[in-house]
Amino acid sequence: MINKFKKTIETSFEKKEHLKKCVDPLLKNTIISIINLLDKGKIRVAEKKNGTWITNQWIKKSILIYFCIFKNKLIISENMNFFDKISMKFEKWDHDDFCKHKIRAVPCSFVRKGSFIAKNSVIMPSYINIGAYIGENSTIDTWSTIGSCAQIGKNVHISGGVGIGGVLEPVQNNPTIIEDNCFIGARSEIVEGVVVESGSVISMGVFIGKSTKIYDSINNKIYYGRIPKKSVVIPGSLPSKNNRFNINCAIIIKKPDHETKRKIKMNSILHLNN
């Protein structure tokens, strides 16, 4: 079935400029099925295979086609209305649905359909876009945004006001990825397909894009687009080539030690679903 979906999407995407004129019912049903599979976590925009993250470009294309062929509709909430092409994930959920999926979502948490939230996750007032994947026992804290197709691992804490970049606008080749057991400090921004590898700690106010220098002060090495596993990262700067000014960078200062782990330890009480 997946291969059939993939073939339909690849063929349709090549002629996406003409899709609005006459939408093939098969394509429409295929897109709906793909969004539902994303919503349930059955498929993902990116997967780690043999230690390497692989982006399923056809799934990303499916989301773009969705925006192309579906019209805006009125989405009615108890206190506010919306006008969009994509429904909210919890729109038709009742008490039993939340208990079954073991998700805690507080008021003003906006989660678009087509994103997946694993069990024992806590969603504070925040925004999670279509195609995103949130692993088990993770927290998305207040006023954070998880961009389209971003991948968040297990036991991850995304602190208040954090921005995790999406891939749909501006169009990016690969999604931003936060691997398992990471902590992202308040008001930090991780964008443009950057990968934060497992066990890393990003301090408050760190801004990392694809072209941001990531200076490993332990090994005197420069990285781009990737935070090596088990790194503690703080904001900093490095001198320009002409030494006339400094350029923003991220600095790896150490590996997480006992004190670091104590400070960022997740509170299991907050993830109880009873």
UniProtKB/Swiss-Prot annotation:
The keyword DNA damage does not apply. Its EC number is 2.3.1.117. It catalyses: (S)-2,3,4,5-tetrahydrodipicolinate + succinyl-CoA + H2O = (S)-2-succinylamino-6-oxoheptanedioate + CoA. SUPFAM superfamilies: Trimeric LpxA-like enzymes. Its main location: cytoplasm. Substrate binds at R104, D141. Keywords: Acyltransferase, Amino-acid biosynthesis, Cytoplasm, Diaminopimelate biosynthesis, Lysine biosynthesis, Repeat, Transferase. One of its GO terms (molecular function) is 2,3,4,5-tetrahydropyridine-2,6-dicarboxylate N-succinyltransferase activity. It holds the Pfam family THDPS_N_2. Pathway: Amino-acid biosynthesis; L-lysine biosynthesis via DAP pathway; LL-2,6-diaminopimelate from (S)-tetrahydrodipicolinate (succinylase route): step 1/3. Belongs to the transferase hexapeptide repeat family. Homotrimer. This is 2,3,4,5-tetrahydropyridine-2,6-dicarboxylate N-succinyltransferase. The gene is dapD.
